[in-house]
């Protein structure tokens, strides 16, 4: 089933010069295509919309601060089972638990600065794509 997913390469990925490597891993998957890509620094309003469900949790403020600390690469990735697939390619949120060969397993350092975000469901993808690519998707 063809799906669309929002993928964000977080400020640590951009700062460490890993965007090319991560994008290359996504592009090498047969049948997946990056249909939109932007480099941008996220404002508070966008971050509040994106992470609103976590407001009030202990990690919310540090997460928003980190995500606003530098540019991110925002992408729309389309393809067969892309939501499940990109999340598998990324690996678990905790880089220590992530297997070698996954993005976080190979390059991740700490939980909050874990390089990549990918939509976790079709519903999340639809909501997130409207936030990051309004009018385009």
Swiss-Prot record:
InterPro entries: NDK-like_dom (IPR034907), NDK-like_dom_sf (IPR036850), Nucleoside_diP_kinase (IPR001564), Nucleoside_diP_kinase_AS (IPR023005)
Subcellular location: Cytoplasm
Any Pfam family matching the protein: NDK
EC number, UniProt record: 2.7.4.6
Residue numbers annotated as active site: 117 (pros-phosphohistidine intermediate)
Keywords of this entry: ATP-binding, Cytoplasm, Kinase, Magnesium, Metal-binding, Nucleotide metabolism, Nucleotide-binding, Phosphoprotein, Transferase
Top-level taxon: Bacteria
Binding site for ATP: 10, 59, 87, 93, 104, 114
One GO molecular-function entry: metal ion binding
SUPFAM superfamilies in alphabetical order: Nucleoside diphosphate kinase, NDK
Designated name of the protein: Nucleoside diphosphate kinase
Annotated organism of origin: Streptomyces coelicolor (strain ATCC BAA-471 / A3(2) / M145)
Organism classification: Bacteria, Bacillati, Actinomycetota, Actinomycetes, Kitasatosporales
Name of the gene this protein is made from: ndk
